[in-house]
Amino acid sequence: MAENKTENPGTEEMEVRLAQLNQFTRRTLTQEEVFLFDVRLCDNEIDRDGERFSLEALEQLKTLFVGKTGIFDHNPKGENQTARLYAAELVQDPERITAAGEVYTFLKGHAYMVRTDANRDLIREIDGGIKKEVSISCAAASQTCSVC
């Protein structure tokens, strides 16, 4: 889920975010050149396939996602590359308990896009809440049944 909660952070916070995202750029980008938004990448709730990420897996993914490119339709063609994750953090909601009995925890990715004429409509759709879902693709080395 895309959440545009980072568009107008304070000056100090913006400097930190710009420093983080500029680690992935060929030149230093300014606040005016980028669009910042947050995405809910994955969580520890049981999904439609009866699977969930453990808290340990979410912690590992937190570092693995940084620097990854956001693409459309799980298709890595160049023209489908849209955004890049420059930071990630785990967020807990102590008021929400998962079906597995844990405090609901999700991995929030902080993403940026370079503002261009070509993505102006996409930015408006993200701001307007139209484009808000994201999907991640991954493969697990093993699965552990929580019942057996």
How would you label these PLM feature ranges?
Residues 1-148:
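Signature of dsDNA virion morphogenesis modules
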